[in-house]
Design a protein with these regions (language model features):
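Structured, active/binding-site neighborhoods that engage oxygen-rich ligands
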Residues: 1-269
């Protein structure tokens, strides 16, 4: 497909995504067809989509800047740092939390295949194979009842687990840990860009993270051209509100036990 076709699809998807987020973009929809013949026109339309205001009838409070997020938090929740546990107790809990997330990834990974099912579908497959309630990793019999299987099933089903198979839920936690180990709490977006380029294969990330990593790589090819990493997340990135932001946050909670406000600030950054 031509670059104009690809860009046109991205801008159309971006417009629809911003509509779902409550932005007033309907007046821009007729411009899609007019802009389709020019990459410059599509890029200009994308900028207008980004700058569109929130609809006046949007019923949700969803601030974008950190201080507004903090101001919208439940005022009854503690934000200041406190130490109620010893270093040894904290270490044990953080280790347990991380290893539990690894085990959970292994447990769910064989089932992560379209069409995606919910708890009732999982229950039905487990009951059909005589394995409900679940007390172990997914078996071949349960996958057969499920009717589809993730390609990783050969390394994540019962009797085949020899290591933790690569998974983005685990990878982003490790990336966050490495970032803090290497750069401390004052890390920058540039530090994160460099870390991702050095450690994160593009095929092991999805959606908006893949888009950002692709742009990070392209920036390396043209170091003399300016770039705005803040813009990467919110422009020409129609999957920007997929679940990646949630699975990237764990490491900052682990790194700031007893200090939820600092953890939130690091995760926001």
């Amino acid at each position: 497909k031509s670059m104009k076709e690809i860009l046109g699809r991205i801008v159309a998807a971006e417009l629809e995504e911003r509509r779902k987020q409550g932005y007033d973009v309907e007046a821009l929809r007729p411009l899609l067809g007019k802009a389709s013949g020019s990459c410059d026109a599509l890029l200009a339309l994308s900028q207008r989509i980004k700058e569109a205001p929130i609809r006046q009838d949007w019923p949700y409070e969803e601030p974008d800047d950190l201080e507004s997020v903090m101001a919208a938090c439940d005022p009854t929740r503690r934000r200041e740092a406190s130490r109620l546990l010893s270093d040894g107790e904290i270490e044990a809990r953080v280790r347990s939390a991380f290893l539990t997330s690894v085990c959970a990834c292994i447990l769910g990974k064989p089932l992560e295949e379209a069409p995606y099912g919910g708890l009732e579908d999982i229950r039905a497959a487990a009951q059909a194979s005589g394995e409900w309630p679940l007390r172990d990793y997914v078996s071949d019999a349960m996958l057969t009842a499920w009717g589809r299987r993730n390609p990783s099933w050969v390394e994540t089903t019962r009797g085949r687990v020899r290591y933790a198979a690569s998974d983005d839920d685990i990878t982003y936690t490790i990336m966050g840990m490495l970032l803090i180990e290497k750069r401390g709490r004052d890390f920058s977006h540039e530090d994160m860009r460099q870390l991702w380029l050095e450690n994160l294969p593009i095929y092991l990330c999805w959606g908006p993270e893949r888009t950002v990593l692709l742009r990070a790589g392209l920036a390396v090819l043209a170091p003399d051209l300016p770039y705005d990493m803040d813009d990467w997340a919110v422009r020409l990135n129609p999957g920007q509100e997929l679940c990646g932001a949630m699975i990237r946050a764990d490491a900052y909670g682990y790194a700031c036990p007893g200090d939820p406000e600092l953890a939130a600030r690091l995760a926001f950054r």
